[in-house]
Amino acid sequence: GDHVKAGVKAYAERWAQDGIVEAGFVDYINDSSKITYPWSMIDKITPRPHEKVQAMLAEDGFEDNNTIITEKHTFTAPFVNAEEVQYLVCEDTYTNGRPPLELGGALYTSRKTVDEVETMKVTTCLNPLHTAMSIYGCMLDYTLISAEMADEDLRAFIQKIGYIEAMPVVTDPGVLNPYEFIGTVINKRLPNPFMPDAPQRIATDTSQKLSIRFGETIKKYIDRGLDKSNLVLIPLVLAGYARYLKALDDNLKPFEPSSDPLLAELQAIVAPLEVGKADQDYSCLKNLYSHKDVFGLDLYEAGFGEQIEGMVKELFAGKGAVRQTLHKYVSAR
């Protein structure tokens, strides 16, 4: 809503400046008794267009369905493959009636509650699990999230991140139950084989996601004086990011990291490190994990730097070390 308001206001002010509209028009769009810009939260996992869906549609006669990859490496097609589960939560601040979206399952509520639903989803119940699966899924050669959910280590990884580590600080919006929400994510949404989502898609722009998806949970532990030793698998996700940046899978074969605005910069930081090299200098990690713009806080100042550094050393031990390290920490929780 705020983004829409900013865009509309910018156009209106420029139009008034250029004499296209009267000055009163700007006052009109800023009058909250007449015009509002409701906040909203939508949650419906929508992967890239998948060739299996494309082939199914072609068999049904819809043949002109080619996927286009844009210059920004986004994917578009004349069809959308998405999941059945969906949530739409809207701020109820309409001034002259509103569409009865509640008849289709949408929720109308306050701005505060919309924000709380978004916080619940993005910092605890869905997005952190997605990112954990994307980082380790890429290194373990997975191309489907649903296939990852059949992997005992990965499934337990996200279950324990969600229920054990993130839930103690979850935001409960009231209109949706966090435990029911995350249960649907783990047991229904992510294992769905008919939703061909890929860890490579989710790994896009990971540097822009870590601060919200994990940094906020760490901050809440600190702010509330909670036992930081309860955080083990979230640090393992962040340790895995350093290993992911080397663009080598667990068999030491190269893979192409997903598009990310900070990819080159962060890869340069870990460039001195080699997978499988004994007794190397890991001091470059202080530069990586003190990046507040990436992690939301200086992880060394927060008391997690040395813990993460130790995990990174295990992940860099050599071929098979990603699986071995993941299994070790997940099974111990």
Question: What function would you assign to each model-found segment?
Answer:
Residues 1-333:
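Substrate/ligand-engaging "lid" and interaction regions
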